[in-house]
Amino acid sequence: NVCIHRMPLEQSLIRPPSQCPKCRFAIPWHLNMPIISWLMLRGKCKQCAEPISPRYIGVEILTGLAFLACWLTFGNQSTPGVLLAVTWSLVLAGLITATFIDFEHFIIPDEITLGGVALGFLVSAALPSLHEAERATASLTASGLGILVGGGSVLAVLQLGKWFFGKTRVPLEENE
């Protein structure tokens, strides 16, 4: 939720602490626990009683269920399974964040997409078997080619759009 709220506003994800958007009450840690706090406060700010959007508890439940599904699918296996569970949890958290930001602002922050690309590349080195490879170098090569083809395809579509329509619909730079 903090990512969904702050990333489009280009605010720090760490500071300042969470606060009520209406009265600016700084939410202490014990009132900022996923799901539990929303239920304890009956969906209202402790200070001003302003309703807290049900989106908050919905995102928390959705993310929790996604993490649970990843753990149940991969986590009970050996070390590679735990790494897969953590990796898929991060990927799903990024997708959930991107989806809700896109619903509200019609953007997907580069930090999410490029972070996912970097995560995929690093996991390829740690788990070469994802690319049906025995060595990390073969897996990294496959991952790198995937990045080049996928990224190149996006850039090609953007360039074609610019040629045909005179503008790009998905800017990759802030001043474009």
Which residues make up each language-model segment?
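A membrane-topology feature that recognizes alpha-helical transmembrane segments
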Residues: 1-176
